[in-house]
From Swiss-Prot:
InterPro entries: A-macroglobulin_rcpt-bd, A-macroglobulin_rcpt-bd_sf, A2M/Complement_sys, A2M_N_BRD, A2M_TED, Alpha-macroglob_thiol-ester_cl, Alpha-macroglobulin_TED, Ig-like_fold
Location of this chain's protein in the cell: Secreted
Name of the featured protein: Alpha-1-inhibitor 3
Keywords: Bait region, Disulfide bond, Glycoprotein, Protease inhibitor, Secreted, Serine protease inhibitor, Signal, Thioester bond
Segment forming the signal sequence: 1-24
Source organism of the structure: Rattus norvegicus
One GO cellular component term noted in the UniProt record for this chain: extracellular space
Main localisation: secreted
Positions glycosylated per UniProt: 55, 247, 301, 321, 393, 508, 750, 777, 872, 994, 1143, 1314, 1427
Length: 1477
């Protein structure tokens, strides 16, 4: 009753709504104007006019109305007879990317006028832009290469200008940017280098369009080792709840295609599809050995998981993981698979079943019956039941598993058609808890199409995906009813085809009608040309207008093949070759195409698979997506009144909805909408459901695009060569080039559409995946399929040896030869003799043997190095002809690749502790010769043969630093302050060489690269509040450091002149610093001061404030800035207090203040402080420097005067900077006094151009560069330098303009020995002698108490041979309350490596800020050390056995007071035992 009452109410509403139309549509003109709901600028659009039953001449106009005014789309159109006509128009580009405008349609005659205004969306046609990187994942320090591709919607190249392109790291820091990037022929290639320690995680490349739209591309940065092999897990896609066994196959294959020997562990876990730890209900594990094909198949019994019982409780699935452990190396890699659990053993897929039916037109159903694997099931009975139509039927599936039905819809009285398809028989299970076996069944519900006269048209299409450039035939079925048909002689059906939001095709079909018929039924075929412009989706609307004004229509969506007009092919000839050989690459494409080439090691893609660049990916780009626009207001058809809140009884589909789904809007006075105002939610129409799952899609084409069967087709094989290749001579392969990206290049194909390149194959034995992306002005984009190239040798040799040994130790060198040929090989293995080592074969006759097919063999030598330094080991494996058989086979050798040679370097180090002394002098000669003597002495305990020395000459004061800007100090760079020593000196070098006009492109490129890398690294240490600290924010728990933030601020501000620095980093740092300023103008300290020299002045606050003021002024802030002005007031007050308190204990603070006042232009205060400092200067040997009165005392017994400490170098350099910053220029007196300090500073330089630590290096190089620029002379002076011994050695160097920056060097032969250095001619030279040697570890009075033990202590435990624990105890015993930051450097025993996880755990301790692990040592960064003992321990394990193990050294030192150092040594618990080598 309720249903009938509601239906009557809706029908009554409909009748009322239609009363006004009755008089209008009897004899009056009928209009329908179809327009895309979304219009694009600068491209031809169409508006289609349909004027029917026209009884007067009318004028048609169309206008777009916006805030900028009214624009006519076309000239007035005068029509005097029935017409269907489409008019083209073009809209000019909008100032914004899109806007809603009003489209006004007017059709006006003498008697009648039709006018309607609707809202349309007008959009600028955006370019299609994407980014391609050379690979999806990068390691720290690698170069990221990428190309920007720009096309129009037709995929033709654009020369587009992008205002900005930039890189964002995981913290959204902009680390690199390019401005005004322009594509040429649609392509632009860019690159940038990652720092050695970047933030790891996802990065973004962002391309900003002129419209403001951003296109993004992601890549990953992380530390990783490329997988040598991949693991493929083969499992069924699905099983049924009735299955008891799952077959799991795991196969491991090297990247060069050969099977992996080893073991596999298979884990099968049951749970719901999320597989979180909470939803796993159980796992089973199986272990097995891989067979000769690298595979293992396991039958896993799954009855314990009770699938039938659990099916109703949760959606079940299995996750399978297989971990393969490679034999010999222990390397592990994994693969995984997933298995769905289904209720039945087979299921139905609906391939055809429309969402709506039409009374009087057959309803077509096509299903495919598939098994649990998705394979079709032929010759099986399929039954169908449609109770609403009184229809039942049965048929048998064909060879493709298909069953077809046609349901008569004449007898359907309801608004819905419910269909049930089942296999064999209907399920007897009524309740959901039934566990009896079920057969496949599926349900589908279709709803009626609305027509007042019960007239319909239906488009029937078979194809799933339409191929390009072909004719597609669409069958149209129609039935027309009603009295109005009696007056018709013919009826015309009109159709439109839409794609990419525009009307592409229109046409019509005329059907003749016999007079007096009350029902007309028939069908006809329409042929639709499939054009490229229709890719990827086309929509077709067909309609006709009946005499009474009723419109009947249907629409259909076509999936069009994602084809590209530019046919690109890439191939290699040959497609398999030896490493380092030549191969021929051929690319074909449309003539004059610009092609981007790429070839990547398959191992990279195994590590991180990426979406392959394909037509599907291109057509899925945002710029290629098409969407319908539905106005939010001003749509007369959308303004529906509310009705009663009940579930609608009808889900009928009307013409209005067909029009809207096609992407059109209709301006009309015809009947196109369902005559009811009841609130019907069309978007919730339920559709057919394959098996049990509910599918709510409304797309008819969905059934055609369902994946049915995944069939792997065999790859095409290369045709066999007709002629055998000629025999090559023995080609020896020496492999040392192992890139991850082999090819990344742009090439242009010639007028014939071909380009050919000769390529050198890298040395990696792997499979390379290559592809080409080409753009043509004529045919647009083209993509090649992936081409494979296999770099492979029939056999090759691998060496196993330690990273380094100490002289006197012995180790076993192993050479393993792997044969991947199906035949045995007579093999000869040779270790090249050398005077640098002795080698004894472990086995007799091991240099010649028969290597079996697909086998491996290891030859070993007991090696004892004799020389120090880098020792080369060269091992060759050669397949040689043999007259006799090889095993049971005839001896054969390969045609190519018969010899493989591998060269590896071993570092042989002397015993004891390394010592280095540097003797530097700035020598300036005039007319007379200038000379000085130098005695190179050695302590009596020097390690034999460890002494070496060299003499260097440079014509420029910064030559050494310029050459070694990334190695200025031989110390770790693991914190935010130390990183800046890699950054700031490059600024001073660039400024200096620029000012002196000595800057070359090579030096500039190198310095800019270092600046960019340092900039990236420093952002690792930034906090969210804009500050910086030594080790970053530690997940938000760390505190920003005031001093370091000021240092970074000034460095970034100065670097802006050379590289991109995101201004926000400078602003953030300044804002944070300003918040640390007190009312007095001084700055409060935040975070720990790693360098205690900052505490050596009046107090922390004044010294710190002087440093920050200096940093702000060096950042180009004026002294009138409020923050700077207040800071200077703080310094002025502090200086007055220092003056009143007397001199003597504030040297460091005064040096900083003098420079700060000089920068501020306060010459008076600068001069006062310099005068005070002059009284405290230490003047000796024609040099001037300053020292702290309370500096740490140095140990006695030094053979040479030790290098000055960091603080002394800093303060002396600050005095130089203060003198050279005099306004308007330094006086001759300033330069003369500075010269004395510069002489002292140069004597403190180390052999790399740096000083003892980081801050002194930065400040001193700043002072040296400014002094060098102030005194630089372009005169043609050519001094010569001679170094000679007291014996026969003599070497002369000439210094002139051409080699001024060149570092000239010679080794000194006599140590110990006396040498004389003489300079003649005119000019200054920088001379430096470096002496290095080793001494045994001796007992001393160190600044640190250091105790090192091993656990176990002795070799009682057999495990002590392979791994043991190192335990350290450290405390400070120096003259200060606490040290600065301390480094503990633990060197590894030869053949041992640290267990990284046990080292990284130490970072959880409060006093360990950072750890660094390499093959040869472990570094621990300690904030500071007091007299309280700190304890640490970690585990090391044996990698390569070594005999006669020597002790390893542990060094603990103050980072800023490097003379405060302690040494200890440790040995393996079993070092006294005979090792198995």
């Amino acid at each position: 009753m309720k249903k009938d009452r509601e239906a009557q109410l809706c029908l009554f509403s409909a009748l009322l709504a239609f009363l006004p139309f009755a008089s209008l549509l009897n004899g009056n003109s009928k209009y329908m104007v179809l327009v895309p709901s979304q219009l694009y600028t600068e491209t031809p659009e169409k508006i289609c006019l349909h004027l029917y039953h026209l009884n007067e001449t009318v004028t048609v106009t169309a206008s777009l109305i916006s805030q900028r005014g009214t624009r006519k789309l076309f000239d007035e159109l005068v029509v005097d007879k029935d017409l269907f006509h489409c008019v083209s128009f073009t809209i000019p580009r909008l100032p914004s990317s899109e806007e809603e405008e009003s489209l006004d349609i007017n059709i006006e005659g003498a008697k009648h006028k039709f006018s309607e205004r609707r809202v349309v969306l007008v959009k600028n046609k955006e370019s299609v832009v994407f980014v391609q990187t050379d690979k999806p994942m990068y390691k720290p320090g690698q170069s990221v290469k990428f190309r920007v591709v720009s096309m129009d919607k037709n995929l033709h190249p654009l020369n587009e200008l992008f205002p900005l392109a930039y890189i964002e790291d995981p913290k959204m820091n902009r680390i690199m940017q390019w401005q005004d990037v322009k594509t040429e022929n649609g392509l632009k290639q860019l690159s940038f280098s990652l720092s050695a320690e970047p933030i790891q995680g996802p990065y973004k490349i962002v391309i900003l369009k002129q419209s403001g739209v951003k296109e993004e591309h992601s890549f990953t940065v992380m530390e990783f080792v490329l997988p040598r092999f991949g693991v493929d897990v083969k499992v069924p896609n699905a099983i049924s709840v009735y299955d008891e066994i799952i077959n799991v196959t795991a196969c491991a294959t090297y990247t060069y295609g050969k099977p992996v020997p080893g073991h596999v562990k298979i884990s099968l876990c049951h749970g719901n599809p999320t597989f979180s730890s909470e939803t796993k209900s159980g796992c089973k594990e199986e272990d097995s050995r891989l067979d000769n094909n690298g595979c293992s198949t396991q039958e896993v019994n799954i009855t314990e998981f009770q699938l039938k019982e659990n099916y109703l409780k949760m959606h079940q699935a299995f996750h399978v993981n297989a971990t393969v452990t490679e034999e010999g190396t222990g390397s592990e890699f994994s693969g995984s698979g997933r298995i769905e659990v289904e209720r039945t053993r087979n299921k139905f897929l609906f391939l055809k079943a429309d969402s709506h039916f039409r009374h009087g037109i057959p309803f077509f159903v096509k299903v495919r019956l598939v098994d649990i694997k998705g394979d079709p099931i032929p010759n099986e009975q399929v039954l169908i039941k449609a109770r609403d139509a009184g229809y039942t039927n049965a048929t048998t599936t064909d060879q493709h598993g298909l069953a077809k039905f046609s349901i008569d819809t004449n007898g359907i009285s309801d608004y819905s058609l419910n269909i049930k398809v089942y296999h064999k028989e209907e399920s007897s299970c009524i309740h959901s808890s039934c566990t009896a076996e079920r057969h496949a069944e599926a349900h589908h519900t279709a709803y009626a199409v609305y027509s007042l006269s019960k007239s319909y048209i239906y488009l029937d299409t078979e194809a799933g995906v339409l191929p390009c450039n072909q004719i597609h035939t669409v069958q149209a079925h129609f039935i027309l009813k009603g009295q109005v048909l009696g007056v018709l002689q013919q009826i015309v059906f009109h159709y439109l085809v839409m794609a990419q939001g525009s009307i592409l095709q229109t046409g019509n079909h005329t059907h003749q009608v016999e007079p007096g018929e009350s029902q007309v039924q028939g069908n006809f075929a329409l042929e639709i040309p499939v054009e490229f412009s229709m890719v990827p989706v086309a929509k077709m609307l067909i309609y006709t207008i009946l005499p009474d004004g009723e419109v009947i229509a249907d629409s259909v969506k076509f999936q069009v093949e994602k084809c590209l007009r530019n046919k690109v092919h890439l191939s290699f000839s040959p497609s398999q070759s030896l490493p380092a050989s030549q191969t021929h690459m051929r690319v074909t494409a449309s003539p004059q195409s610009l092609c981007g080439l790429r070839a990547v090691d398959q191992s990279v893609l195994l590590q991180k698979p990426e979406a392959e660049l394909s037509p599907s990916l291109i057509y899925d780009l945002p710029g290629m997506q098409d969407s319908n626009f539905i106005a939010s207001s001003n749509d007369p058809f959308e303004d529906e009144d509310y009705c009663l809140m009940y579930q609608p009884i009808a889900r009928e589909k009307d013409v209005y909805r067909y029009v809207r789904e096609t992407g059109l809007m209709a301006f009309t006075n015809l009947k196109i909408k369902l005559p009811t105002y009841c609130n019907t939610d069309y978007d919730m129409v339920p559709l057919a459901v394959p098996a049990v799952a509910l599918d709510s899609s409304t797309d008819r084409g969905m059934y055609e695009s369902l994946p049915v069967v995944a069939v792997k087709s065999p790859l095409p094989q290369e045709p066999p060569r007709k002629d055998p290749p000629p025999k090559d001579p023995v080609i020896e392969t020496i492999r040392n080039y192992f890139p991850e990206t082999w090819i990344w290049d742009l090439v242009t194909v010639n007028s014939s559409g071909v380009t050919e390149l000769e390529m050198t194959v890298p040395d990696t034995i792997t499979e390379w995946k290559a592809g080409a992306l080409c753009l043509s002005n004529d045919t647009g984009l083209g993509l090649s399929s992936v081409a494979s190239f296999q770099a492979f040798q029939p056999f090759f040799v691998e060496l196993t040896m330690p990273y380094s040994v100490i002289r006197g130790e012995a180790f076993t060198l192993k050479a393993t030869v792997l044969n991947y040929l199906p035949t045995s090989l007579p093999m000869a293995v040779l270790l090249e003799a050398s005077p640098d080592f002795t080698a004894v074969p472990v086995e007799n006759n091991q240099d010649s043997y028969c290597l079996g097919a697909n086998g491996r063999h290891t030859s070993s030598w007991l090696v004892t190095p004799k020389s120090l330094g880098n020792v080369n080991f060269s091992v060759s494996a050669e397949a040689r002809q043999s007259p006799g058989p090889c095993g049971s086979e005839v001896a054969t050798v390969p045609e190519t690749g018969r010899k493989d040679t591998v060269v590896k370097v071993l570092i042989v180090e002397p015993e004891g502790i390394k010592k280095e002394h540097t003797f530097s002098s700035l020598l300036c000669a005039s007319d007379a010769e200038l000379s000085e003597t130098l005695s190179l002495l050695l302590p009596p305990t020097v390690v034999k043969d460890s002494a070496r020395a060299h003499f260097s000459v440079m014509g420029d004061i910064l030559s050494s630093a310029i050459k070694n800007t990334q190695n200025l100090i031989q110390m770790p760079y693991g914190c935010g302050e130390q990183n800046m020593v890699l950054f700031a000196p490059n600024i001073y070098v660039l400024k200096y060489l620029n000012e002196t006009q000595q800057l070359t492109e090579k030096i500039k490129s190198k310095a800019l690269g270092y600046l960019r890398a340092g900039y990236q690294r420093e952002l690792n240490y930034k906090h969210k509040d804009g500050s910086y600290s030594a080790f970053g924010d530690h997940n938000g728990q760390g505190q920003g450091n005031t001093w370091l933030t000021a240092f970074v601020l000034k460095s970034f501000a100065q670097a802006r002149a050379f590289i991109f620095i995101d201004e926000s980093h400078i602003t953030d740092a300044f804002t944070w610093l300003s918040k640390q300023q007190k009312d007095s103008g001084c700055f409060r300290s935040s975070g720990s001061l790693l360098n205690n020299a900052m505490k050596g002045g009046v107090d922390d606050e004044i010294t710190l404030s002087a440093y920050i003021t200096m940093a702000l002024l060096e950042s180009s802030l004026p002294d009138t800035d409020p923050v700077v002005s207040k800071a200077l007031s703080c310094l002025e007050s502090s200086w007055e207090n220092i003056e009143q308190g007397g001199n003597g204990s504030f040297v460091y603070t005064k040096a900083l203040m003098a420079y700060a006042f000089a920068l501020a232009g306060n010459q008076e205060k600068r001069n006062e402080i310099l005068k005070s400092l002059d009284k405290e200067a230490i003047k000796e040997d024609n040099s001037i420097h300053w020292e702290r009165p309370q500096k740490p005392t140095k140990s006695e017994g030094y053979l040479y005067t030790p290098q000055a400490s960091s603080a002394e170098v800093e303060m002396s350099a600050y005095v130089v900077l203060a003198r050279l910053t005099a306004q308007p220029a330094p006086s001759p007196e300033d330069l003369a006094l500075s010269m004395g300090t510069i002489k002292w500073l140069t004597k403190q330089q180390n052999s790399y151009g740096g000083f003892s630590s980081t801050q002194d290096t930065v400040v001193a190089l700043d002072a040296l560069s400014k002094y060098g620029a102030a005194t630089f002379s372009k005169s043609q002076k050519t001094p010569s330098v001679t170094v000679q011994s007291s014996g026969s050695f003599s070497q002369k160097f000439q210094v002139d303009k051409s080699n001024r920056l060149l570092l000239q060097q010679v080794s000194l032969p006599y140590i110990p020995g006396n040498y004389t250095v003489s300079v003649s001619g005119e000019g200054c030279v920088y001379a430096q002698t470096t002496l290095r040697y080793n001494v045994p570890l001796e007992k001393q009075q160190p600044a640190f108490a250091l105790k090192v033990q091993t656990v176990p202590l002795t070799c009682n435990n057999p495990k002590g041979q392979n791994s043991f624990q190192i335990s350290l105890e450290i405390s400070y015993m120096g003259s200060r309350p606490a040290s600065n930051m301390v480094i503990a450097d633990v060197k590894m025993l030869s053949g041992f490596i640290p267990l990284k996880p046990t080292v990284k755990k130490l970072e959880r301790l409060g006093h360990v800020s950072r750890t660094e692990v390499t093959t040869n040592n472990v570094l621990l960064y300690l904030d500071q050390v007091t007299n309280q003992t700190l304890s640490f321990s970690f585990i090391i394990q044996q990698d390569i056995p070594v005999k006669n193990l020597q002790p390893a050294i542990v060094k603990v030192y103050d980072y800023y007071e490097t003379d405060e150092v302690a040494f200890a040594e440790y040995s393996s618990p079993c070092s006294s035992d005979d090792q198995n080598v």
